[in-house]
C-alpha cells in the first residue's frame, strides 16, 4: 500500500512515477554522460523541432543546475559524471530523485564509502529534504547515524518485521538486541 491505495510497482521507473526513489549502495552511473544526462536518463525533457521531438538540452541543463543547488552541489550540469567523487555521484542520484518530486527517498547504506565531511554534507541534504516533506527510508547498520537523523526506527530480521519505535530514548544496545534477537554481552 502507498498513500492509502494498493499498488503494484513493476520497475524503478514505475516507482519513480509514483514518487518513490532509491539511491542504491552500489551506484550505477553512466560515467561518460553528463550530470544532467544521468539525472534525466530515460525521461529527458523534450521539445518540438518541426515535425520532430528532440531532447530539450537547454531545459535539462537549467533544471539540473537548480536541482544541484537544491542538494547543495555547485558543479556544472554538463560535466561528465566520471569526473566526480563518489559522494558527488551520490548527490547526483539524490538530485535525480528530487527531480521526480519524490515523496519517499530510500537510501541504502548511503555512507558506506563517504568521508566524515561527506557524511555531514549528506546529512544536511537529508535534513533539507525532510523539511520539504520528503520521507526518508535510511537503511544502515551504523547505529550512531540512525539515532542522529531518524525520527523512528523500524527493525527487520531475516525479512520479518520486528517493530517500529520512536528514536527519542532509544539506545544502540536496544536496537542491536532487536536486530539480532537476543541480548548481547560483548560488542567488538
Predicted regions mapped to residue ranges:
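Glycine-rich phosphate-binding loops of nucleotide-dependent enzymes
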Residues: 1-188
